[in-house]
Amino acid sequence: SSSRYYVFDSREVATIYPGLARRFDAYDFDIIHSQTQFSLGVLAHWVAKRQNIPHVTTIHTLYTELIDDYPLAVLSGLLALSVAFPVALKSQPVLPRVHRETIKHLNKRDMKTALSRQGWRLTAAFANKCDACLSPSQHLARILIDDGGLTTPCMVLPNGLDSTRYRSARAADSPIPKAPGEKIIICVARLSPEKRQMTLVEAMPHLSGLPVKLVLVGPGPSQEELGRRAEELGVADRVILTGKCSPEEVAVLLKQADVFSLASYHFDNQPMVFLEAAACGLPIVYCDERMTECLTERNAILTDGIEGEDFARVFASLLSDDARLAALSEGALEVAQQFDSETMTRRLINLYEDLLVSYH
């Protein structure tokens, strides 16, 4: 069963209860791999313990960076996990490390830091009950170790991509008209505050002298707000909100575009869309200095700041230089080859095999 959880816009969250793990006794599992550290992660822990099999968990994203957008929800979630984890995992309590004398002097920034650290300590506490932990990026692994106290072996395993769909996609199949000489900036992501598409919309007035469109691909709660902001800024005719698209449609839109951009900051880890963009030969413009996987000087540009005008400066320079665009596009295709899904799958299978040997 499931219930509504208000942190992420009332998404469905699995409901677990004591005794649920027994229902899986009929299945002859060799290994358990959880992709979340919340209710289903706890269920995975219970099943692995009952069946005496290895438990691997993947930590996908920087959950605590949602504090700015969902402060009360994240705070309540941290409090709930601080109480629930010691009971569900039979572990020591994970208490916040804030000295009582400093609490009354905490400002907003200090409070966010304390909450973030507590979030990573809880995440690491879960991972420390597993046999292995996977992180898609080096910087996330370092946060887990330094801020969370992770001691379980952690493998950095970047996302892999089967590029077949992107190689076969044709720009000519796009429903979006593109005039000769016109350039397209594209962002593929859920339309929500943490993805910061508003920053890209606010870059567009600074590009009024260039024939350029911004295509925002994906559904989400911010769609209407983004449309209104484009109207206010007088760029609605150059900002296209596609809504939800199929994977095949996304591939076509990426093939048609000239630049991929993502404005999320200290939230994402190793977004799959970076790999998809690289597979289509798209240069990437981003602002989060902590993201490194799939981002090199050969295919990506890090902005000097995180605001719309910072992105606009990079866009204006890049879109006016066809030679640089071509060089970055070639570099993107080369980078994408390093993240072949078969290579990443083999590394994961090797980990599974090593764990199974250690259990028998």
Residue ranges and their predicted role:
Residues 139, 160:
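Carbohydrate-associated surface elements
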Residues 145, 161-176, 349, 359:
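Acidic anion/phosphate-binding donor-loop and adjacent secondary structure
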Residues 177-204, 215:
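Conserved donor-binding/catalytic core segment of Leloir-type glycosyltransferases
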Residues 227-245:
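Nucleotide-activated donor-binding/catalytic signature segment of Leloir-type glycosyltransferases, i.e.
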Residues 274, 279, 283-286:
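Short hydrophobic beta-strand element within catalytic cores of glycosyltransferases
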Residues 288, 297-309, 317-323, 337:
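Conserved acidic donor-binding segment of nucleotide-sugar-dependent glycosyltransferases
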